[in-house]
A protein has these predicted regions:
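Short, charged, surface-exposed loops that flank catalytic or proteolytic processing sites
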Residues: 144-150
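Surface-exposed intrinsically disordered loops and tails
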Residues: 115-122, 349, 481-488
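Short, well-ordered beta-strand elements within core beta-sheets of diverse protein domains
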Residues: 138-144
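Histidine-centered catalytic/metal-binding microenvironments
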Residues: 453-544
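A contiguous strand-loop segment
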Residues: 2-134, 154-303
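Glycine-rich, aromatic-lined ligand/substrate-binding cores of catalytic
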Residues: 232-379, 383
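Substrate-recognition/cap regions that form aromatic- and gly/pro-loop-enriched pockets
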Residues: 339-475
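Short Pro/Gly-enriched beta-strand edge/turn motifs at strand-loop
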Residues: 60-66, 152, 349-357
Length: 544
């Protein structure tokens, strides 16, 4: 998908949580309705067949419960997009990226090849399934892992076994770590752990800009990769690091075939080795990374002719330390942003008509949802993970919190219809955006008030629910990681009691959204109606 991602390490976030967040944007001219659902173990397939690639995979018989935000329509498969399981492992998949022609030549994508000819003919060629992709990844990984590292390992094994037909970035997190995986060609992959005191920004471009091969093939503290990455790079001359290729210079020789060896550095830049840097990137991708980092490190020079980074810089860091700890409001703003405060804002008044539409903004018309998954270290496991969800175009909506460890989700978000309806959150938000867009300045005050109210109510609701559960646990245990109501311990009645509390909180949040989103639609519809091009102020004499 055409998405934007921001990841926040636990020491860079405002409350010590790991936060992974991504906009899920449809391709140009397409709008995919979204919903928010819980998947029970009995509903998880045991034999999986991809709709797009036709790959078939036998799955383990012990899946766990998980909650996701998939597409409503199944014409392109499940497309779970973002989710968290009962073990407080979270995933967001995928951030569509690109690799260069050298990589594609060395390890082609594993694409579906339809059958050719008639089955009984002598020249018949059977169908060749493709690999796995965005459609499949969360469904194949999330129900079977208990830590983020386990998730990376399972995903890596699937990529090496079945391959992939597209280039993707995949985020996997738990309460301690965030890992970002990038696919390299059809079967290879790299993964880097987001430093705890950093945030990372990814805008549809292969982003990791530093990789330690010594760690990946040694202690694996911060880096992981496919088992033959060094040989793959050497064989196909993918490293572009300058320097004399001798072992004393920190490089190691690896076989490149044909009886030759190629020296590789212990550290290299994957963005240069595997990625792209094209004029399209400078319009579509790099400006988004520039804007996110401009907001989180504002004291740097971003605008003068001497600025270190511009919207078209190819070397904007993948991760960096923010000037202040990052809040969920920061994340929601950034993933709804449209270059506010710059000449590139499509709703702005500075710059020119050309500059205001020069770059692709983060908050675009075709966003299906934004999901920020917060895994909190200071509460029991049962209520540890909160999914902040918004549907529709970001500048016209706001993210609301929902507990992930539930058996069911509110109907207002769960039962999104394929066709337009004001009976669910997705379509109501879509209508608000379309009505308000042409009258940004006249309607924006209603939208800003709505967003502030949603987030404030959400924070109050989460704090109140956390306190309610903590009060219930006081008589049970003082160990907040293992008290009997944590969803993984205690008897069935205890577990169901916690689920009931969390689901009641989610329903309360959904009820708030239904009431206030409907009011927002009324406000922007009335205001925009008065500003229609065919409006006429004079009424007939009998009109009141």
């Amino acid at each position: 998908m055409s998405c934007t991602t921001i990841l926040v390490g636990k020491n860079a976030s405002y409350d010590g949580s790991t936060i992974i967040a991504r906009d899920d944007d449809s391709g140009s001219g397409r709008y995919d309705p979204k919903r928010f659902v819980a998947v029970a173990p009995d509903d998880q397939p045991r034999h999986y067949r991809s709709v797009l690639s036709h790959v078939e995979i036998e799955l383990p018989d012990n899946p766990c419960r998980y909650t996701i935000a998939p597409n409503v329509l199944n014409n392109r498969g499940i497309l779970a997009e973002a989710g968290a399981n009962e073990h407080n492992v979270a995933m967001s998949a995928t951030e569509t990226i690109a690799v260069n022609e050298r990589v594609l030549g060395a390890d082609p994508m594993v694409e579906l090849r339809p059958a050719v000819g008639e089955p009984d003919s002598t020249d018949y060629q059977a169908e060749q399934p493709g690999g796995i992709g965005e459609e499949d990844i969360i469904t194949l990984v999330l129900p079977y892992v208990t830590t983020a590292r386990e998730g990376v390992a399972r995903l890596g094994e699937l990529l090496e076994t079945y391959g992939t037909y597209e280039s993707n970035g995949i985020i996997i997190s738990d309460v301690n770590e965030i890992w970002y995986v990038e696919t390299i060609g059809g079967h290879h992959w790299i993964a880097r752990r987001v430093p705890d005191d950093c945030y990372a920004t990814i805008p549809n471009q292969l982003g990791i800009d530093d990789f330690d091969l010594a760690d990946a093939f040694g202690e694996q503290r911060e880096y992981l990769c496919s088992a033959d990455l060094r040989e793959f790079m050497a064989m196909h001359h993918l490293d572009r690091t300058m320097g004399t290729p001798v072992s004393s210079n920190g490089r190691h020789a690896h076989s490149a075939g044909f009886g030759t060896t190629v020296a590789l550095p212990t550290r290299f830049n994957p963005r240069k080795a595997f990625g792209t840097a094209t004029p399209k990137d400078h319009i579509y991708n790099t400006p988004r990374a520039w804007y996110m980092q401009r907001r989180l490190n504002p004291s740097e020079d971003w605008d003068s002719p001497a600025a270190r980074y511009t919207p078209e810089s190819d070397d904007i860091p993948w991760c960096r330390v923010p000037e202040d700890k990052v809040s969920l409001e920061d994340v929601d703003f950034l993933l709804s942003s449209h270059f506010e405060g710059t000449p590139y804002d499509p709703y702005g008044t500075t710059g020119t008509a050309e500059s205001r539409h020069r770059y692709r903004p983060i908050g675009v018309n075709r966003t299906g949802h934004m999901v920020a998954i917060q895994v909190r270290p200071y509460v029991p496991a049962a209520n540890r993970t909160v999914m902040w969800v918004s549907f529709g175009s970001g500048p016209f909506t706001a993210a609301a919190p929902f507990y992930a460890n539930v058996n069911d989700t509110p109907a207002y978000l769960r039962d999104t219809t394929p066709e337009v309806s004001t009976g669910n959150l997705y379509w109501t938000n879509r209508l608000i955006a379309v009505v308000a867009d042409a009258h940004w300045y006249e309607t924006n005050r209603f939208i800003e008030g709505y967003a502030e109210g949603v987030r404030a109510f959400g924070h109050r609701l989460i704090e109140r629910t956390d306190e309610q559960l903590l009060a219930r646990s006081d008589a049970e245990s003082t160990d907040t990681n293992a008290w009997p109501l944590d969803g993984g311990h205690g008897d069935e009645k205890d577990v169901q009691g916690v689920a009931d509390v969390l689901e009641a909180a989610n329903d309360e949040m959904a009820d708030y959204l239904r009431e206030h989103t409907t009011k927002l639609l009324n406000d922007v519809l009335y205001t925009s109606s008065n500003l229609m091009h065919n409006s006429f102020a004079m009424s007939d004499r009998w009109a009141e």
